[in-house]
């Protein structure tokens, strides 16, 4: 499947589309299922981000705004160097642009061919985030970096 299929999938989840979520979570554990269905109670407004900035979607609710970049792979570890360094340049750009607004980019990583919850969310390390966004930032696992 093309990446935009997973982008649409995440948009439907974050928008709280109950029918879609109920179909998706049929094979999930009870805990995963209840967590996914919880979003139907307080969904996000999800906008498709246009242009070459690289952010795919923006999720907004209350005083939270999440610019989200969607990635997918069959591999459990996503390496930003896999695309000739383009993804590395992109994450640096995302960090610079979002830090001016006191927010951070979220990387939604969709694992292909897995049972249960296929989504993993990450934030880049070392961001200076303010307000309520700082709470979320601390909760999300950080992308790991290597020496190269």
Which sequence ranges carry the predicted segments?
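Alpha-helix C-cap/termination motif
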Residues: 17, 60, 100-101
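Intrinsically disordered, low-complexity terminal regions enriched in charged/polar residues
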Residues: 116-148
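Short acidic (Asp/Glu) patches
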Residues: 87-93
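Nucleic-acid nuclease catalytic cores
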Residues: 95-127
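Acidic-basic catalytic patches of nuclease active cores, encompassing PD-(D/E)XK
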Residues: 1-49
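Short beta-strand-loop-alpha-helix junction that forms the active-site gateway
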Residues: 70-84
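Glycine-rich, phosphate-binding/catalytic loops in enzymes
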Residues: 84-87, 125
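Active-site beta-strand-loop-beta-strand hairpin of nuclease catalytic cores
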Residues: 45, 49-71
């Amino acid at each position: 499947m093309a990446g935009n299929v997973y982008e649409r999938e995440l948009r439907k989840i974050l928008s709280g589309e109950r029918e879609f979520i109920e179909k998706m979570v049929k094979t999930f554990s009870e805990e995963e299922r209840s967590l996914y269905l919880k979003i139907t109670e307080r969904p996000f407004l999800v906008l498709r981000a246009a242009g070459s900035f690289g952010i795919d979607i923006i999720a907004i609710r209350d005083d939270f705004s999440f610019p989200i970049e969607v990635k997918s792979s069959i591999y459990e570890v996503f390496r930003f160097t896999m695309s000739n360094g383009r993804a590395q340049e992109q994450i640096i750009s995302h960090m610079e642009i979002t830090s001016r607004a006191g927010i951070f980019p979220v990387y939604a990583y969709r694992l292909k061919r897995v049972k249960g919850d296929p989504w993993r969310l990450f934030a880049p390390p070392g961001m200076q985030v303010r307000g309520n966004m700082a709470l979320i930032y601390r909760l999300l696992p950080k992308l790991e970096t290597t020496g190269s």
